[in-house]
């Protein structure tokens, strides 16, 4: 859900085993910065530090080498540089990512809607899609109010529900694997002007520090597998968040952490293994009709959004 998003514009550091994410994140980052400048959408480019604790230097170096190979700006900071730039930061090494940014997601989405409607599109909110039928002359989308929308081409980008709307004739073998991520806000200022990330962990990028455009700090998200769509943040998780943050910011006051929001990542499994990449499924029907389904659109989906649109357009 785009409203449950940290608003980070990712540089494209992490996705060595996710070719679609890697390509579309790097391309999307440039498109998104250009779009924000063109449309006067609020954004900043504070950069990011990815920090390593003792024994984690090899993983940090592998991320750096991949970034360099892909033309993503990055450099390893020396111990003295870290102490000079962020004296409150605790780590043995850090990677600086200057092209990481933050964006006002609400303004971005509003601008995209304006563009869509200016091009002749009609936005129909609060309409539950019951199914997609490809058996007729046109693809038919059935809504819960009895309406049927027909088109030659349908783009299924329904997030957590996208897999359930893939036409029945498409064999794919994917199943949903939902990962919930919660955020905690911090009640006062933090001594950092850049985003701070630990090294990636299973299921996500670790409990990291993000800043909004007003400088307010949030920590998260964590990652826990869920079977139901529960968006409540558990206050009792505060100590867990505090312990994670204290690894790189020892002076964090756990008492200043409070539940903020939660989101659920629409990840996928196939043959029992997690598929950590964007997936594009296409249903080819007679007469040029088709349904294109966008699956597994979690992070870096926001960063990649305009590049994803380019890719889908090429598929049509």
Regions found by a protein language model. Give the residues of each.
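Dinucleotide-binding Rossmann-like beta1-alpha1 core, especially the glycine-rich loop
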Residues: 7-81, 91, 206-207
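Short beta-strand to alpha-helix junction loop
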Residues: 16-27, 51-59, 96-114, 232-237, ...
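Helical element adjacent to the flavin cofactor pocket in flavoenzyme catalytic cores
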Residues: 95-153, 306
């Amino acid at each position: 859900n785009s409203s449950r998003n940290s608003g980070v514009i990712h540089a494209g550091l992490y996705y060595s085993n996710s070719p679609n994410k890697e390509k579309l994140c790097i391309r999307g980052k440039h498109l998104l910065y250009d779009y924000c400048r063109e449309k006067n959408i609020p954004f900043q480019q504070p950069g990011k530090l990815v920090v390593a604790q003792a024994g984690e230097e090899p993983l940090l170096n592998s991320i750096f080498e991949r970034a360099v190979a892909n033309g993503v700006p990055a450099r390893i900071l020396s111990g003295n540089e870290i102490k000079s730039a962020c004296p409150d930061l605790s780590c043995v090494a850090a990677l600086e990512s200057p092209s990481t940014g933050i964006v006002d997601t609400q303004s971005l989405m509003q601008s995209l809607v304006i563009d869509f409607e200016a091009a002749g599109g009609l936005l129909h909110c609060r309409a539950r899609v019951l199914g997609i039928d490809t058996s007729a002359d046109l693809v038919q989308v059935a809504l819960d109010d009895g309406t049927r929308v027909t088109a030659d081409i349908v783009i299924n980008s329904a997030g957590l529900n996208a897999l359930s709307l893939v036409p029945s004739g498409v064999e794919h073998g994917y199943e949903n694997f939902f990962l919930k991520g919660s955020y905690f806000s911090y009640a006062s200022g933090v001594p950092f002007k850049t985003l701070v990330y630990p090294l990636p962990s299973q299921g996500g990028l670790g409990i990291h520090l993000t800043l909004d455009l007003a400088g307010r700090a949030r920590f998260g998200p964590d990652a826990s597998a869920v079977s139901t769509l529960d968006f409540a943040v558990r206050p009792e998780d505060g100590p867990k968040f505090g312990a994670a943050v204290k690894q790189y910011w020892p002076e964090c006051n756990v008492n200043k952490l409070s539940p903020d929001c939660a989101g659920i990542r629409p990840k996928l499994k196939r043959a029992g293994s997690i598929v950590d990449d964007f997936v594009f499924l296409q249903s080819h029907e007679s007469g040029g009709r088709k349904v294109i389904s966008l699956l597994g659109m979690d992070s870096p989906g926001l960063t990649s959004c305009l590049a994803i649109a380019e890719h889908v357009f090429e598929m049509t």
